[in-house]
Amino acid sequence: MIMKKALAVVVFGGALFAAGAAFAARQKPALPDFAHWTATELKGYEGPLREKVAGEHRTSSVKLADYGSSNVAISHREANGIPEVHAHMDDYFVVESGEASLVVGGDVVNPKLVEPNETRGDSIKGGEKKRLVAGDVVHIPTGMPHQLLVEKGKRFTYFVIKVKAK
């Protein structure tokens, strides 16, 4: 009789443990601020972005996430960008497709503060030109002038990460 009660307690306890473990597995908190964009997902943005290209600079972008201290977007260009300088943000580009030249360094010609911490200009004097193609990754530190140049008839799609500098 004691063996039957002990066996019943073990079986009941095991069942309770298994049910509790299953419940806990379902109750795991989501990974806050975790994001994963697959290569296929990112490629899927190119067509819709090309359809939305507008303005003199023939660009379009979609912000994918904003985490406060950083944000992520995917952008598409079919013409030259505007020279710019970010006072408090580092830029990282991951080239998805196409090709462009990135002018970095030097001085912005006719700089204008267009919004707090953001300067734009007419061109960059004395910068270095770097050719970018699919798979390339660049880091543009805070305060560094930069401009993307896209040859007529070419396209350029890139994943952008902006991080507040310390």
Residue spans of the language-model regions?
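A short, N-terminal "cap"/entry segment at the start of jelly-roll beta-barrel domains
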Residues: 20-85
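Conserved metal-binding segment of the jelly-roll/cupin
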Residues: 131-152
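An anionic, turn-rich surface loop/hairpin at beta-sheet edges
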Residues: 111-133
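Short, conserved beta-strand element in jelly-roll/cupin
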Residues: 87-106, 115-123
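His/acidic/aromatic-lined binding-pocket segments of jelly-roll/cupin-type domains
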Residues: 84, 91-94, 129-130, 137-138
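A short hydrophobic beta-strand segment most commonly corresponding to one strand
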Residues: 153-166
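Bacterial N-terminal signal peptides
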Residues: 9-19
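Bacterial N-terminal signal peptides that target proteins for export
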Residues: 1-10
